[in-house]
Regions:
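Surface-exposed cleft-lining segments at the edges of enzyme active sites
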Residues: 95-104, 142-147, 177-188, 209-214, ...
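N-terminal carbohydrate-binding/catalytic regions of secreted carbohydrate-active enzymes
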Residues: 53-162, 313, 317, 322-338, ...
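Secretory targeting and sorting signals
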Residues: 5-31
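Structural preference for beta-strand elements that scaffold enzyme active sites
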Residues: 96, 123-127, 167-171, 207-211, ...
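C-terminal region of N-terminal signal peptides and the immediate post-cleavage residues
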Residues: 23-49
């Protein structure tokens, strides 16, 4: 009896202590004093998401409503069977969806809901490119974006909330970091990096894999990009992307990205291979000789390279240069040359 009585007293004391600890933890989470602890769990450094983490479940989604798909249908209706067959080689591949804002919230949500529903039906993962940051392209061919940082963040939050719970990958603002080395951009460097940091945290809180701008192998030094990426919040992202809308081959891009990844503690990366086929002569705007790269696919194995993607839409103009229409518009003759140039190189090889 005395032993059982002491045991009951001991268990009661332990229960009181546990309840007190639970109450203290609850207070920390909901009170202001626990705000820092709560925020620490609200955003997740990419290292926390590496183990057993599938970034592209089901593989890459082929968008049936892409610009090349629309053009293929139009050519078929017009009876241009040869051109339609060439464009089909582009349209049949998974290509990233570009969200370029500003647009109405209704239009944005309509695009996202439609694409997410179709990707879910196909059992694939869509890739979205955000391209609407203030002072986009620093006044060059693709100038534009939101007028204020606040409006950009509001737009980003809408996208993040909509993507939450869906397999989806976000590539955040091509050129936004690498371009800061230009004289026309230097005045916005600190503001830009801080804005990207805020934006990437938004997606991290909603458990969405984000890649930030990593430039390319022939632009900024890896050490320069590593410093900027840290300031832009890369620790809250999956990693970075390289070669978007550019033409450099996989080998130099992979070597550059591996160096940059090493400087960032092993951050993962993806590479745009949409137009990196052999034959490119060095010009960047609708260049002659460019060819489609290898078809996009996710990569397997224990390396930081997650996927080779088609981020830039093959056939979409780089801008009003070399006979092209405005940036992003369909450039038919250029699209056909990308396909035929790849075919020619394959035949020669």
């Amino acid at each position: 009896m005395p032993f059982r009585s002491r045991r009951r007293t001991l268990l009661t004391s332990i229960g009181v202590i546990l309840l007190a600890c639970l109450a203290a933890v609850t207070f920390l989470v909901v009170s202001g004093s626990g705000g820092a602890a709560h925020r620490a769990h609200a955003t997740r450094p990419w290292q926390d998401a590496q183990t057993n983490h599938q970034v592209f479940p089901g593989g890459l989604w082929v968008n049936p409503g892409s610009l090349p798909a629309e053009e293929e249908q139009l050519l078929s209706k017009e009876g241009d069977v040869t051109a339609a067959a060439l464009v089909q080689q582009i349209a049949s591949q998974p290509i990233a969806v570009w969200l370029t804002g500003p647009s109405s919230r209704t239009a944005l949500l309509s695009t996202l809901h439609r694409d997410l529903a179709e990707a879910k039906l196909a059992g694939k993962t869509p890739v979205f490119v955000l391209y609407a940051i203030p002072d986009r392209d620093c006044g060059n061919y693709s100038a534009g974006g939101f007028p204020t940082n606040a409006s950009y963040l509001s737009w980003s939050e809408t996208i993040a909330r909509t993507l939450r719970g869906h397999p989806a990958v976000v590539l955040m603002e091509p050129d936004s970091i690498a371009m800061l080395g230009r004289s026309s951009c230097t005045s916005i460097t600190k503001t830009r990096l801080h804005l990207l940091d805020e934006a990437v945290r938004t997606y991290s809180r909603d458990h969405i894999d984000v890649y930030l701008d990593g430039g390319n192998s022939h632009w900024q030094k890896a050490s320069v990009m590593a410093t900027r990426l840290r300031e832009a919040g890369v620790k809250y992202a999956r990693g970075f992307f390289t070669n978007v809308s550019n033409f450099y081959g996989v080998d130099p891009e992979r070597a550059y990205a591996d160096r940059l990844s090493g400087m960032l503690g092993g951050a993962h990366f993806v590479i745009d291979v949409s137009r990196d086929g052999p034959g490119w002569a060095g010009s960047w705007c609708n260049p002659d000789g460019a060819a489609l790269g290898q078809n996009p696919h996710i990569t397997l194995g224990d390396t930081p390279l997650d996927a080779l993607l088609w981020v830039k839409t093959p056939g979409a103009s780089d801008g009003t240069c070399n006979g092209g229409p405005a940036a992003g518009r369909w450039y038919q003759s250029y699209a056909l040359s990308l396909v035929t140039n790849r075919e020619a190189h394959h035949s020669a090889g």
